[in-house]
Amino acid sequence: MAKKLNYSPNKLASALKSGKTHIIGVIVPSVQAHFFASIIHCIEDGLKDSGYCVIIYQSNESVENEINGVKTLLEAQVDGIMASLSLETQDVSHFAEIVKQNKPLILFDRVNADLKVPTITLDDFRAGYIATQHLIDRGYKKIAFITTIHQIKIFNDRLEGYKAALADNGLPIIEEHIIFGGLSIKDGRFGAGKLMRGRNKPDAIIAGDDFTAVGVIKKLKEIDETPPEVGVIGFANEAFSAYITPNLSTIDQHAPQIGKACAKMFLKMINQPNPYTNMEHIVLDPTVVERESTNKEAV
């Protein structure tokens, strides 16, 4: 009968009755990165059968935008929020209101230990370690590392993994081979230029993400040190990394698994009187995706 009358349920009335809007907020640094876009896609896919839709808010690496995002989403009466922190975020007190309202808050990828909430992360120490070990196994010995100046746990852990791999292989940690700056194509070009102008030039460079790695490759091409002559590896396995020249070796951070785990965790939390009962902290293992930029045998 309802179908014949072209009836559709009033979602506002349903929300008022149930206390739930079936809307989820997701805050990410940027949807331009395939990594975050893939996570969002899998969150949406994992929630649609339960009747949830997603509002996306980009922080663009700004803590001010992130604060506004939390406020905006709470005003929209979302049932919960999932977030990956901006590079600028140190104080996470703006997320406390979500917990105070007894709404699910899940942090993924970039997290902060001050927030006692469920998390889904990569083993970033291992990510830094296996990126370095991969280069060592391919014959590179003087390995540099370009990372962010911001004190974000995932990037700190990767740097520590890099240092541990060097030490385990009896290779020195050379401070001038560690560049702190931004994470972008421009920053990759700048960092590679600085490294290759130094007295102790590296024979391989680990870039903080795949965008930075593109900048590194561009600079190396300009000075006729095209990879894999100088090895380059990034992080995130962005969609473009398989199609640039030379194509880019990278660390796969398993974005689809992160998104699926976020959706599954949310559905578990939303059906509990206290969503923070039996909190989970899921840690995924990274893997190396080897391509031309570290494959000396292809030369």
Across the structure, where does each feature detected by a protein language model lie?
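Hinge/beta->alpha junction and helix N-cap segments in small-molecule ligand-binding domains
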Residues: 29-38, 56-65, 85-87, 110, ...
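Alpha-helical recognition/docking segments in bacterial nutrient-uptake
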Residues: 18-133, 137, 195-197, 201, ...
